Amino acid sequence: HSKQKGRLHPFEILSIGGDDVFLIVPAHAALPIATTIAEEAEKALSGRPITRRDKGYEWTRVHRIQMPYETKPTVQSKVGLSSGVVIAHHCTPVFFLRRLVEELLKSAKGKAKRLRDKGYYGATVDFLVLKSTAMIATNIHDFRRSALKRNNLHLTAKPYTVPELYALLEVVKRLKREDFPRSQLYRLREQLEKGWLASIVEYFYFQARLRSSEEVRKALDKVWIGTEQQKGPKSIGLWMRRENDDPENYEFETVLGDL
């Protein structure tokens, strides 16, 4: 990984086999390292004729963020290095971490496969912050369905494409630069539990009275706009339209629960 302020991050390679790599790195650097590996792998492979794809994709149909540049991607790699990332305490058993990572990787690859139908061949990343081993009673899918879903609302937007994950990390950096109160962030997250309308009202009220609200808008709802939908309600406030198999049953998701 590239140097950060003149230092290299320590890491441990537990296994390399086939196209899978299992690494242990410092928690604060795990997501930046995952995005860097995916991006560098794609750059290298897109320069080789056998893995180069001279065809772009429609940004607004793939990524849920504003396009950060004017030109659309025109060259891709046919191979993307998706990742599963677990951020956990150092004493967590490795065998348990590996099981969770494999679940997350399967989830990330599932999204990558669906996005191929839209012409996107890049990597995706799914991650989990594990507070205790008792947090996941069965598997990650069941945990998210019970703890992070309220009717048609998903309190998470995972998995992410690599550009989306970069944008999410930028949100964190911007909020830190502005000394954004964590208590306010926790309060906004609590409002998500109350439902779509209540959380939107609280969010707009919060924006009206907070001095740094413009920075929050720049980092969140001016960046996270959701993908282009053919019909139905659009994204509003902290909620983005979620794509599902049944376009008649509208679902929403938010990145706020992932910050």
Task: Set out the residue ranges of the language-model regions.
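Charged, helix-rich terminal subdomains or tails
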Residues: 1-259
